[in-house]
Regions:
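Soluble catalytic regions of membrane-associated enzymes that act on cell-envelope
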Residues: 186-353, 357, 374-375, 379-393
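Internal/C-terminal transmembrane anchor helices
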Residues: 162-187
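N-terminal membrane topogenic signal
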Residues: 2-19, 102-106
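Membrane-interface coil-to-helix junctions
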Residues: 26-69, 73-78
C-alpha cells in the first residue's frame, strides 16, 4: 500500500486554520475586554478633513489603516479574528519563502511558523496596529522579492532527511504553538492586569454592578487601587457604601476617585463616578481630559459618552453634533441610527442646565459632593460620598454636623440608618450622649459597641479589628 501524502495546499490550509483558531481563542477568551478597549481608544472617520489632519505621509497611512481596522473591534469576535489573521498572514508569507527556497517543503512548513511567537509577543501593546501592519508589509515585500529572485533560478536547498520528516514537524509545531501561547498570554503579567482593568471598566460602563462586585474582591483591593475604586463605585450604586467600604482598604476620601491622575483610564473612571453622582458638567470635563490622551485626537469612547451625556441632559444641539461625527465611521453609523429616535424626542425640549453658582473645585471631592447635595438634597449617592469620606478621614466632628443635615432629608421617616453611620454615632455618644436623640440604633450595634469600649479601655485595640473587622470602630482604632 502506497504512503498517502496530503497535497501541499491542504497542508498549508491546516497550518493556517490551526494557527488562526489558537490565536482567535487566546484573544477572544483571554483578552475579550482589551479588544473592546482598543476600539474605544481609537477613532476613524471618512470625513476628508479628518484624513488630511490624521495622515502625515508616509507613517500616517499606517495610523489611518490601523484606525479603520480598530473600529471593527467593537465586536470582539471580529477583533479577535483580525488579531489572529495578522499573525496568519505573516506565517503565509513565510510559507511562500519556504516553498521557493527548499526542496520537499511539505514537512518544512513549520519553519514558516517560527516568526509567529515573536510577532505576538508585542501585539497586545500595539494600540494603533502600526506594528502589526509593518510586520505584514515587510513580510509581503520579502516574500515577493524571494519569489521574483527564484523565478529563473529554481535550485532549492536540500536539508537532511531527519529534519524534513513528520515527527520533527509535529514536535516543532507543538513547541512553536506553546511558545506562541506563552508569549501572548503568560509572559507579560501586566497584560492580564490590564485586561482585568478593562473588564471592570466595561462592567461599570454598562452598569453591571453585581458582576463588578463579583470580580473586585476585598483581597485584591488591598493592593490594587483600580479594584478598590471600582468596588466602591459598585457599592455606591447599590446603596451599600456605608455598609461595606472598609472591607476594601479605604484610607481616605481620595480612595473614591483618582486625584491628580491624567491617564485615560483614571479620567474615564472619574467620569463614570460623576455620572453616578448626577453631575453632567463634570462628566464632560473629565471626558474631554480623557480625550487629550488619545493617539487619534479623540476616540469612540469619548464621543459616545459625550453624545449619551447630552442626550440625558436633553441638549439636542450638542447631542446631534457628536452623533453626526460618529455617523461618519463605518461601524458607529449603526450605533447612531439606534439613538436617532431618542435624539428626535428631545428636539424641542429645553436642555437641563445645572444651577448657576460658584464653580465647583474638583480638587476636593468632598467639597464637590457637598455642593451638589446642597443643590439636590435628595441625592443619596452624594450624601453617602460626603459621610463616608468624612468617616474615611476619621473626622467624626464634621461627620456629625453633616449627618444632622443629611438625616433631616434622607432619614426623617424612620428609614434604616446604614451600619457605619450608626457605629460613628455610637462612638460620638461616649462624649456627647445627645447625638443619639431621634435616631434608631440597632440593638446589635449597641451591644457590640459595649464590647468595643471594654476592649479599648483595657488597651486591646488590636482585638477590635479581629473581632469586628467590617466596622468603623476597627478602622478608627
Amino acid at each position: 500500500m502506497r504512503n498517502s501524502k496530503l497535497p501541499l495546499y491542504i497542508h498549508i490550509s491546516l497550518y493556517a486554520v490551526t494557527m488562526f483558531l489558537v490565536l482567535w481563542c487566546m484573544w477572544y477568551f483571554c483578552y475579550h475586554y482589551s479588544l473592546l478597549w482598543l476600539e474605544g481608544f481609537s477613532y476613524f472617520s471618512t470625513l476628508p478633513d479628518v484624513l488630511s489632519l490624521s495622515v502625515v505621509l508616509p507613517e500616517g497611512i499606517l495610523d489611518y489603516a490601523g484606525a479603520f481596522l480598530l473600529q471593527f473591534y467593537y465586536y470582539p469576535i471580529v477583533g479577535a479574528a483580525l488579531q489572529a489573521l495578522y499573525a496568519v498572514v505573516v506565517m503565509l508569507c513565510a510559507m511562500v519563502m519556504v516553498m521557493r527556497l527548499f526542496d520537499n517543503p511539505s514537512h518544512l512548513l513549520w519553519f514558516a511558523a517560527l516568526p509567529v511567537p515573536f510577532f505576538v509577543e508585542g501585539q497586545y501593546w500595539n494600540y494603533t496596529l502600526t506594528r502589526s501592519l509593518t510586520w505584514i508589509i515587510v513580510s509581503v515585500v520579502i516574500a515577493v522579492v524571494v519569489y521574483l529572485l527564484t523565478i529563473r533560478n529554481r535550485r532549492r536547498l536540500h536539508l537532511p532527511a531527519f529534519i524534513a520528516n513528520v515527527a520533527v514537524e509535529i514536535v516543532a509545531l507543538v513547541a512553536i504553538m506553546g511558545f506562541t501561547v506563552y508569549n501572548l498570554g503568560y509572559k507579560d503579567n501586566s497584560c492580564r492586569e490590564y485586561e482585568h482593568i478593562w473588564k471592570m471598566e466595561h462592567l461599570a460602563e454598562t452598569r453591571q454592578w453585581d458582576a463588578l462586585l463579583d470580580i473586585t474582591s476585598p483581597d485584591e483591593a488591598q493592593v490594587n487601587g483600580f479594584v478598590r475604586r471600582y468596588a466602591l463605585l459598585a457599592l455606591l450604586e447599590k446603596g451599600k457604601l456605608a455598609d461595606g467600604m472598609f472591607l476594601y482598604n479605604v484610607t481616605s476620601a481620595n480612595d473614591f476617585w483618582f486625584k491628580d491622575r491624567e491617564e485615560p483610564m483614571c479620567r474615564n473612571y472619574n467620569a463614570m463616578l460623576f455620572r453616578s453622582l448626577g453631575v453632567p458638567n463634570e462628566v464632560i470635563h473629565n471626558t474631554f481630559q480623557q480625550q487629550l490622551q488619545s493617539n487619534f485626537g479623540t476616540s469612540f469612547a469619548v464621543l459616545r459618552r459625550l453624545a449619551e451625556t447630552n442626550l440625558e441632559t436633553k441638549n439636542y444641539a450638542l447631542a446631534k453634533k457628536y452623533m453626526d461625527i460618529l455617523s461618519h465611521s463605518t461601524v458607529m453609523s449603526c450605533w447612531v441610527e439606534d439613538r436617532k429616535p431618542q435624539l428626535e424626542a428631545i428636539r424641542n425640549v429645553k436642555p437641563k442646565v445645572e444651577v448657576n453658582g460658584e464653580q465647583f473645585k474638583t480638587s476636593d471631592l468632598l467639597e464637590v459632593t457637598s455642593e451638589i447635595f446642597n443643590l439636590h438634597p435628595e441625592n443619596r449617592k452624594c450624601a453617602d460620598i460626603v459621610l463616608c469620606g468624612l468617616l474615611a478621614e476619621k473626622n467624626c466632628k464634621d461627620f456629625y454636623l453633616a449627618f444632622k443635615v443629611i438625616a433631616d432629608k434622607q432619614y426623617a421617616h424612620s428609614e434604616s440608618i446604614p451600619r457605619y453611620y450608626q457605629e460613628a454615632l455610637m462612638l460620638l455618644s461616649v462624649n456627647t450622649p445627645g447625638v443619639l436623640d431621634g435616631y434608631s440604633i440597632d440593638s446589635d450595634v449597641r451591644s457590640e459597641f459595649q464590647d468595643v469600649k471594654k476592649l479599648v479601655k483595657n488597651g486591646e485595640k488590636d482585638r477590635v479589628k479581629s473581632l469586628y473587622p467590617n466596622t468603623f470602630w476597627a478602622y478608627y482604632f
